[in-house]
Amino acid sequence: VSIRAVMRVYAERSGDAGARTPKEIFEIAEGIRPGNREAAIAAFEELGEMAGDALASAITLIDGLIVIGGGLSGASKYILPVLLKEMNAQTGMMDGARFGRLQKEVYDLDDEKSFAGFARGEAVEVLVPGTNRKVGYDPCKRIGVTFSKQGANRSIAMGAYVFALNHLSK
C-alpha cells in the first residue's frame, strides 16, 4: 500500500512505461489528462483492496475510528468503495460455511446515509447482574472509516494546540 504500488499497477495495466506520479494517475482517472483511464482507476482500486485487507487485520487489535490521510486520500472516491467492500467481505470455512471477516460492520463516515446507520446503533436495556438496575447497552459492533480533509500539517498543529491547552492548567 504505497504510491509506488499505484505507479506500478498503472504501468502494468496500461503498458505505459513512463514514470507517472500518483497525481498524474489520478488526473488520468478523472479524464483531465490523457492516458488509460481504466488502468488508472484500477490502480487506485487495487490500493483500496490491499489497504482494506490490512486495515481489516489491524482493526481486530484496536477499537477506534479509522482516519486515512496523506496524498493518496485525494483519490478516495476510487479507493474507499473497494476498501469498504474488502473490510465488509465474508470469509469461509472448509465446509462452506460463510461469515463476515470482521465481527464489526464497517461504515463510510463521509456518506450521510452510512453515517446515519453508524450513529443510530441498536441500544437495548440490560439488567445489571445481582441488582434490579437496568443500563443501556448497544450490541451493534461497528467501526467508521473516513478520509482526512485537512492534511497532515494542519492535523498535527491542531493536535499540538489542544495538547498545549490541556497542559496549561496543570
Regions found by a protein language model. Give the residues of each.
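ATP-binding/phosphotransfer module of carbohydrate and carboxylate kinases, centering on a glycine-rich
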Residues: 1-170
